[in-house]
C-alpha cells in the first residue's frame, strides 16, 4: 500500500544544521562534506511527512554556477520501505530543482547498499540515466596493509621528496589552486585542500619534485578506528618512477600508532593495474563494493 506524504523542500543554512535537525536520518556518508566548510554551495532538504511524523529525508547541495544538484543522503524509515515515499521525495526535489533553474541532478551510490535495488528501480521510473561505475571501494584491516613489506619501496625515486600534506607551503598551495581553476581534469583529481578540516594529518602526504607538488595521498578519519583514503594522485609523467607505490607505502606504514583498525580506499574502475595489485596483495579484503553515479538532465522550462 502506498503512503501519501506531504513533501516539504527548502534551503538550509548549513550541513551541520541539517545533521542537528535530523540526527537519525542523515546517512554517515555525508561526514566527508562536514570536512569541507569552504564549499561554495547551498544546502537543501526534501522532507516527507505524514501528520507530524518524518517519514523520509533527502539532503542535497546546489552549485548554481554549474546548474547542479547533488544528492548526498537519501533515507526512508523502515516502516515506509516500498510504499512510494522515496519516489515522492525524489520527484518533489526534481520539480523544485526545475523551479530553481537547476539543469542536472546527480547521485552516487554503492551496489553493496541494501537500498541499491530499490533506488535503481526508482531511477528507472523517474527517467534517470543508467548508472555508470566510478570506483571500486575496498575495506581491509590496517594490519593487512601495514604488513605487506612496504619497507622495500621506501627508497625514494631520484628527485622526489615525500612530505606531510600539512607542510605544503602557501606558494605551492597557491599554484595548486590556480591550476584547479583552469584544468578540468585536475579539478576531478584535486579533491582536498591544504588546511581543510578533518584531514588525517598522520597519513596524508604530498609528493614533491623540485619544490613542485606532483602528487598526494589524502585520508580522513571517519571514526576513531576507521580511516578512509579519499584521494591518491600522481602526475602522469611521474607515475613510471614508482611514486604511486611509494606514497601508498609511506602512508600505510604511518598507520602504526594511530589506533586505526580498518581502512577504506578506492580504485578507479579503469585502473586495471592498481586493481590487480590490490586484489593480489591486500588479503583478506573485508568488503568490496562498486560506487556508481547516475544523473538526470532536467527540463528547466516545466515541472512534473
Where are the regions that the model predicts?
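Structured beta->alpha junctions
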Residues: 75-78, 111, 233-236, 267
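C-terminal structured domain segments across diverse proteins
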Residues: 239-304
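A conserved beta-strand-loop-helix scaffold within acyl/acetyltransferase catalytic domains
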Residues: 29-46, 50, 55-68, 74, ...
Amino acid at each position: 500500500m502506498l503512503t501519501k506524504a506531504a513533501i516539504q523542500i527548502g534551503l538550509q543554512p548549513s550541513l551541520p544544521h541539517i545533521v542537528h535537525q535530523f540526527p537519525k536520518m542523515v546517512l554517515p556518508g555525508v561526514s566527508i562534506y562536514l570536512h569541507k566548510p569552504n564549499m561554495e554551495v547551498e544546502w537543501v532538504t526534501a522532507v516527507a511527512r505524514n501528520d507530524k511524523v518524518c517519514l523520509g529525508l533527502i539532503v542535497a547541495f546546489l552549485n548554481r554556477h554549474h546548474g547542479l544538484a547533488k544528492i548526498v543522503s537519501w533515507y526512508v524509515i523502515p516502516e515506509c520501505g516500498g510504499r512510494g515515499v522515496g519516489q515522492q521525495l525524489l520527484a518533489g526535489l526534481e520539480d523544485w530543482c526545475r523551479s530553481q533553474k537547476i539543469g542536472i541532478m546527480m547521485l552516487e551510490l554503492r551496489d553493496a547498499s541494501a537500498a541499491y535495488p530499490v533506488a535503481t528501480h526508482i531511477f528507472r521510473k523517474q527517467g534517470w540515466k543508467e548508472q555508470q561505475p566510478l570506483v571500486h571501494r575496498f575495506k581491509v584491516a590496517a594490519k593487512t596493509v601495514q604488513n605487506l613489506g612496504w619497507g622495500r619501496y621506501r627508497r625514494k625515486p631520484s628527485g622526489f621528496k615525500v612530505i606531510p600534506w600539512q607542510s605544503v607551503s602557501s606558494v605551492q598551495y597557491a599554484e595548486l589552486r590556480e591550476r584547479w581553476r583552469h584544468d578540468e581534469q585536475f579539478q576531478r583529481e584535486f579533491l582536498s585542500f591544504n588546511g581543510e578540516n578533518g584531514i588525517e594529518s598522520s597519513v596524508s602526504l604530498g609528493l614533491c619534485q623540485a619544490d613542485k607538488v606532483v602528487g598526494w595521498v589524502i585520508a580522513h578519519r571517519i571514526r576513531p578506528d576507521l580511516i578512509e583514503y579519499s584521494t591518491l594522485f600522481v602526475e602522469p609523467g611521474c607515475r613510471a618512477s614508482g611514486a604511486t607505490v611509494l606514497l601508498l607505502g609511506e602512508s600505510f606504514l604511518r598507520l602504526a600508532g594511530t589506533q586505526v583498525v580498518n581502512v577504506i580506499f578506492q580504485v578507479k574502475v579503469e585502473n586495471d593495474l592498481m586493481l590487480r595489485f590490490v586484489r593480489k596483495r591486500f588479503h583478506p579484503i573485508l568488503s568490496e563494493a562498486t560506487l556508481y553515479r547516475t544523473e538526470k538532465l532536467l527540463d528547466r522550462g516545466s515541472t512534473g
